[in-house]
């Protein structure tokens, strides 16, 4: 599917599990690569790379928190892959929603997710299921097209 977004690129905070769920790395890469190819800025694109754990280990926890909070504040939207439970991703989603940011939480159809995500009635939260990486890329592109006036 071609990119649906026709304006200037958006600033997108991409969130995914770092310490667990790395079997979904090809999905993370498909999502990030599609958003970058469509002209969007993703300060957290490194999360989709195999070296992310080593990269994040050399940064102090307080630095990660301060950096990521600023990136979320500066983002137009937050896009998360939530198939693997993650304290950090849950916090990032809640923080972004608290700021009134649109959030997309994608997960594999065969993986249950926290009811704090699936049961959240916030109008700024979209929860979508997928089976294949190509499907999640289309979901992301549709979500971004719906929020391109931000």
Residue ranges and their predicted role:
Residues 2-150:
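Conserved catalytic or regulatory cores that recognize and/or transform ribose-phosphate-containing ligands
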């Amino acid at each position: 599917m071609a990119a649906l977004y026709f304006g200037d690129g958006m600033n997108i905070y991409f969130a995914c599990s770092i310490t667990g769920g790395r079997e979904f790395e090809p999905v993370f890469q498909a999502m990030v690569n599609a958003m970058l190819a469509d002209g969007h800025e993703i300060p957290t694109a490194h999360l989709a790379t195999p070296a992310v754990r080593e990269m994040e280990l050399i940064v102090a926890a307080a630095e990660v928190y301060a950096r990521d909070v600023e990136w979320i504040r500066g983002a137009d939207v937050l896009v998360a892959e939530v198939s693997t439970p993650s304290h950090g991703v849950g916090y990032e989603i809640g923080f972004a929603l608290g700021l009134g940011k649109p959030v997309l939480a994608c997960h594999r159809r065969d993986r249950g997710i926290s009811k704090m995500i699936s049961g959240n009635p916030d109008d700024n939260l979209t929860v979508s299921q997928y089976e294949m990486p190509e499907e999640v890329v289309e979901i992301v592109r549709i979500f971004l097209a719906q929020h391109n006036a931000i």
